[in-house]
Design a protein with these regions (language model features):
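Active-site region of glycoside hydrolase catalytic domains
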Residues: 1-4
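Structured mid-domain segments that build the active-site/substrate or prosthetic-cofactor binding neighborhood
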Residues: 6, 12, 22-123, 129
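Short, charged, surface-exposed secondary-structure boundary motifs
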Residues: 13-17
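Catalytic domains of carbohydrate-active enzymes that cleave complex glycans
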Residues: 73, 99-172
Length: 172
């Protein structure tokens, strides 16, 4: 009759929970609880609370993290991914997380393409490129992605002037 609620609020988001120091502490706690209960509730975060509209390219980690939750007996999962005012691709993020909760083995790229085409129509290929370029820039920069982040912290990485020009080209 007891739920164990674990929150990964202090974890970075540019790589999966198993790939960063802050995430490893969370995983250790989750694995410890999973050894003694099958009743774990995970409260996960996927948006920048200080800057809701700032880019938050973490789509590439969603599946591995959700698989990890399932493997460790998370029977409940709350993914705080958008506020009442929306957020960076809030609808896409909600769609992907929801689909992955039902089927952690689903093809994320297919799900993303399906949603983008249905929601954005002819703009879908450009938005897909934008997402992929930004994810690559984040990973390549080596900078952390955090839920209380300033876009200024990414001015030499995913938001550097050359990439802003590239993003604008995709939107034109």
């Amino acid at each position: 009759n007891v739920n164990i609620m674990l929150c990964d609020i202090d974890c970075d988001r540019e790589v999966t929970l198993t790939e960063n120091a802050s995430g490893k502490e969370f995983v250790k706690a989750m694995e410890g609880w999973a050894a003694i209960t099958n009743n774990i509730f995970v409260w996960d975060y996927g948006i920048n609370f200080d800057n809701y509209l700032a880019p938050f390219p973490n789509f590439h980690i969603l599946q591995d993290n959700i698989r990890l939750f399932k493997k460790n007996h998370a029977t409940m999962h709350f993914s705080q991914i958008a506020g009442s005012r929306g957020g960076d691709f809030a609808e896409l993020r909600a769609y992907l997380v929801s689909k992955l909760m039902w089927n952690p083995e689903a093809n994320v790229d297919s799900l993303m393409q399906h949603f983008l085409h249905g929601y954005y129509g002819e703009a879908a290929p450009y938005l897909y490129q934008y997402i992929k370029v930004m994810e690559g820039a984040l990973i390549g920069s080596g900078q952390r992605l955090w839920i209380y982040d300033s876009p200024v912290s990414h001015k030499y990485g995913m938001l550097k002037p050359q990439l802003i020009r590239r993003y604008n080209q995709l939107f034109d």
